[in-house]
């Protein structure tokens, strides 16, 4: 056993993780994506108009940049704009993220037979920087990841009952995928149904006749139902032609156009190459990137002895990677829905993973904490913007930074505590970042 994960570790890191996701949730400088600002603008304008549809915007070309579900959620959470705060806009995103973590916990705990493993999977996923960056702000990613993941969690949780279900599971999966499409894009039905097809095919022991006769209609039913839910946007919007032009043609079809001179050259070189897609997908793990790499290496070494669940998780990752390597715009953000699967793999291999991935994570955390402390200390001692005392930290901030630094150092030199501290260190770094940026809030 290499650094087993105890309930004491789990409870401490769980409390730390919950605190981390709510700490600074209303900050203007929280890690996020630039899409949040136009999304907030659409919510405000639509709420002021007093109607759910059409979506409103004063910015050219972004009125129908995304389906309406996330904007409707923003309208509800802010009380039609009456409670216009970042916290009111963002807390539904955190709720979606925590629900995804909860159902990931249930699925992994069920098929592994260990609640510690399930809890570890949820905590690892929450520790990924991409989860923290995209799972807190007012963005489309939290509901998209939740609704896309739910059917796959159900297959892992119920196993045979879900795979053999002739109608109930396909109907529920279709509704879940439909909600995901209504949150992000109809394009996600392609990787989702491709992954489901691979799941069914493997369940039938790679027999093409069996999967065609027993499961093909299920995948078709799921796809049709999901697209039907998405099509409600066209039915309810008084200007469906604008939705078609701005969203279907502008936002989605344009992603297949070559970014430079040649689609196939873009595929193998440059910033939108398939290699960059692989790299940015790994980088979604943030400080745990090398832990993820060591997990994939371990899975390759044990490829002849993989369990059913491990194979299904890898098939899910491969399906999304293959599909999203086809558009000319390739980004690891498109593969956020498979990060829970990769977190589950890390949790399942946790006790067998080598130390080097965790030690690199701890060294990266040490660098982050040292950089934040150095920059913050210099700003506090300097006359920021020509006025002394503007950039000030409390003793609590420096006490927290000292504690975090000491804990990470302990993890580097203690083999027994290395893995658990590396996981906790991710959340400590996020808290340190938020605390270090607090003077920008004017407090």
Task: Explain the meaning of each model-derived region.
Residues 171, 299-443:
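Membrane-embedded architecture of ER/inner-membrane glycosylation machinery
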Residues 7-13, 104-127:
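Transmembrane-helix signature of polytopic, membrane-embedded enzymes
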Residues 39-45, 179, 183, 188-306, ...:
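Transmembrane-lumen/periplasm boundary regions of multi-pass, lipid-linked membrane glycan transferases
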Residues 110-115, 151-170, 180, 350-354:
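Membrane-interface transmembrane helices that cradle and orient dolichyl/undecaprenyl
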Residues 86-89, 133-144, 185:
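Short acidic/glycine- and proline-prone juxtamembrane loop motifs at membrane-interface regions
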Residues 91-112, 150:
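Transmembrane-helix motifs of polytopic, lipid-linked glycan transferases
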Residues 20-24, 38-62, 69-72, 76, ...:
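Extracytosolic helix-loop segments that constitute the early lumenal/periplasmic catalytic or substrate-binding loops
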Residues 6-36, 222-238:
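Transmembrane signal-anchor helices characteristic of membrane glycosylation enzymes that use polyprenol
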């Amino acid at each position: 056993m290499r650094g087993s994960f105890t309930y004491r570790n789990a409870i401490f890191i769980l409390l730390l993780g919950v605190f981390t996701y709510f700490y600074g949730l209303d900050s203007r400088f929280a890690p996020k994506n630039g899409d949040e600002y136009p999304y907030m603008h659409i919510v405000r304008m639509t709420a002021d108009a007093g109607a759910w549809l059409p979506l409103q915007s004063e910015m050219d070309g972004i009125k129908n940049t995304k389906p309406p579900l996330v904007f409707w959620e923003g309208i509800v959470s802010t009380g039609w704009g009456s409670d216009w705060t970042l916290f009111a806009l963002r807390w539904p995103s955190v709720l979606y993220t925590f629900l995804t973590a909860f159902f990931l916990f249930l699925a992994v705990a069920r098929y592994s037979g260990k609640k510690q493993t399930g809890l570890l999977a949820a905590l690892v996923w929450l520790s990924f920087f991409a989860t923290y960056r995209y799972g807190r702000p007012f963005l489309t990613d939290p509901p998209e990841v939740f609704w896309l993941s739910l059917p796959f969690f159900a297959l892992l949780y119920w196993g045979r009952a879900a795979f053999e279900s002739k109608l109930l599971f396909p109907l529920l999966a279709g509704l879940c995928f439909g909600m995901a499409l209504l949150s992000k894009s109809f394009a996600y039905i392609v990787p989702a149904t491709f992954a489901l097809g691979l799941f069914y095919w493997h369940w039938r022991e790679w027999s093409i006749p069996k999967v065609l006769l027993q499961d093909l209609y299920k995948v078709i039913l799921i796809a049709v139902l999901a697209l039907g839910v998405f099509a409600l946007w066209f039915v309810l919007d008084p200007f469906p032609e604008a939705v078609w032009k701005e969203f279907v043609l502008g936002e989605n079809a344009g992603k297949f156009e070559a970014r430079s001179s040649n689609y196939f050259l873009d595929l193998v070189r440059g910033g939108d190459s398939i290699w960059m897609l692989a790299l940015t997908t790994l980088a979604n793990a943030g400080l745990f990137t090398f832990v993820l790499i060591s997990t994939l290496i371990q899975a390759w070494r044990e490829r002849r002895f993989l369990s059913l669940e491990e194979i299904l998780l890898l098939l899910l990752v491969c399906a999304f990677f293959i599909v999203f390597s086809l558009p000319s715009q390739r980004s690891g953000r498109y593969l956020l829905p498979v990060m829970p699967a990769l977190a589950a793999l890390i949790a399942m291999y946790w006790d067998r993973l080598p130390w080097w991935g965790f030690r690199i994570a701890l060294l990266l955390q040490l660098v982050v904490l040292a950089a934040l402390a150095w920059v913050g200390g210099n700003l506090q001692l300097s006359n920021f913007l020509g006025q002394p005392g503007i950039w000030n930290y409390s003793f609590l901030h420096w006490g927290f930074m000292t504690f975090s630094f000491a804990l990470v150092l302990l993890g580097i030199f203690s083999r027994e505590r290395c893995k658990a501290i590396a996981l906790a260190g991710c959340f400590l770094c996020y808290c340190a970042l938020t605390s270090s940026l607090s003077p920008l809030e004017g407090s």
